[in-house]
Structure formats: structure tokens, C-alpha cells
């Protein structure tokens, strides 16, 4: 099974992207957040892949910019009633860190903002993901700062910055290191663009 793809972004659709790897095009299903964070057409990206096989659909590839995104996708599908579509929907409104925070707070309303996830399924998700390693970092107990509960959750700036640097070919460990250093220096008000710029400067690019 395919676990990772590095190649040029050839096409981007509403639910999938075509990644050109040495002349071979791989059709990869991605969530909306992932698609929005892909580099421009023709530029190189790295996607962590979850390969799934079924008799009806054959082999399908699901792509993520970070290993945490892929891990959360797999953990969500271990829950009864959560398939690939619902798992993608959850990760479209909550990053892995935000999902871990919602689970820790038993905030089913946050999970329930995902398209197609009703109250019962949202409750099952926050219950069954208890003590699961959704993210590598510490779990924040604070609620999202958005004043409109029905609005999609804002992606974590550090996570977006790390993903952007990885899309430029920076190794994940180095991307996390420079982004975390930049976040500590710039403070919590730092924008994604500021973190990326500081990270690239630290890397000498």
C-alpha cells in the first residue's frame, strides 16, 4: 500500500488532487482544508497517504499534509458510523489539535459542526476518542475563540505554517522546529504568513 507521495500538483478538484510523481498521476482524495493549503499547480508537495481497498471502489488514496491529520483520519474511522466522508468532514472543521481539545472537553457541539455528523454521532466520537493519541503535542482545554458556534473552526496557524513549509519540501521535523520557534518569538497573534516567513528565514531560504 502507498504511504506517502511526493510530487507536483497537477490538478486540484473539489474533493481530490492529481499528484504527478515522475510522470505517473495519482488521484488523491483530500479534505477541503488540505486542498486549500496545497501549493500552486506545478509546485511540489508531500502528502501522507492512507490507502483503502474495497470490492466496490477498488483502491482509494486519501491524502494529508501531516501525519497527525492522517492519524486522526484513521482513528475517526475506527468509530462505528464514521466512514471516510464523515472523517474528512470532521477534519475540515477541526484540526487534530482542535479535535483533541474538543474530545478532552467532551464538546460534542464542536464535532457536530462537521457536515453529516449529527448529535448522536458527535457524542460517540468524543466518547470513543478519549485517551486516543490524536496529536503528539499537549492537549489544550480552552474552547475555540470563535464567537459564532456554527462557523467552521479556524485552522491552527502553527499547523498551517508547518504544512505550508512541508509543501515546499521542508522535512516535517525541521518545519515544526522553526515554526514553533517563530511562534514563541512572535506570540499568539502571529499570522500563518508571518510564521512561514520567519521559518523560511531560519532555514536560510
Curated annotation (Swiss-Prot):
Single Gene Ontology BP annotation: SOS response
Region (Domain I): 1-65
Record localization: Cytoplasm
Domain II: annotated segments: 66-144
Keywords per UniProt: Cytoplasm, DNA damage, DNA recombination, DNA repair, DNA-binding
Record's GO cellular component terms: cytoplasm; Holliday junction helicase complex; Holliday junction resolvase complex
Molecular function terms from GO: ATP binding; four-way junction DNA binding; four-way junction helicase activity
Region (Flexible linker): 145-153
Top-level taxonomic group: Bacteria
Database matches in Pfam families: HHH_5 (PF14520), RuvA_C (PF07499), RuvA_N (PF01330)
InterPro entries on file: DNA_helicase_Holl-junc_RuvA_I, NA-bd_OB-fold, RuvA, RuvA_2-like, RuvA_C, RuvA_C_sf
UniProt comment concerning the protein's domains: Has three domains with a flexible linker between the domains II and III and assumes an 'L' shape. Domain III is highly mobile and contacts RuvB.
Family membership: Belongs to the RuvA family.
Record-linked HAMAP family: DNA_HJ_migration_RuvA
Binding partners and assembly: Homotetramer. Forms an RuvA(8)-RuvB(12)-Holliday junction (HJ) complex. HJ DNA is sandwiched between 2 RuvA tetramers; dsDNA enters through RuvA and exits via RuvB. An RuvB hexamer assembles on each DNA strand where it exits the tetramer. Each RuvB hexamer is contacted by two RuvA subunits (via domain III) on 2 adjacent RuvB subunits; this complex drives branch migration. In the full resolvosome a probable DNA-RuvA(4)-RuvB(12)-RuvC(2) complex forms which resolves the HJ.
Function recorded in the entry: The RuvA-RuvB-RuvC complex processes Holliday junction (HJ) DNA during genetic recombination and DNA repair, while the RuvA-RuvB complex plays an important role in the rescue of blocked DNA replication forks via replication fork reversal (RFR). RuvA specifically binds to HJ cruciform DNA, conferring on it an open structure. The RuvB hexamer acts as an ATP-dependent pump, pulling dsDNA into and through the RuvAB complex. HJ branch migration allows RuvC to scan DNA until it finds its consensus sequence, where it cleaves and resolves the cruciform DNA.
UniProt name for this protein: Holliday junction branch migration complex subunit RuvA
Lineage: Bacteria, Pseudomonadati, Pseudomonadota, Alphaproteobacteria, Caulobacterales
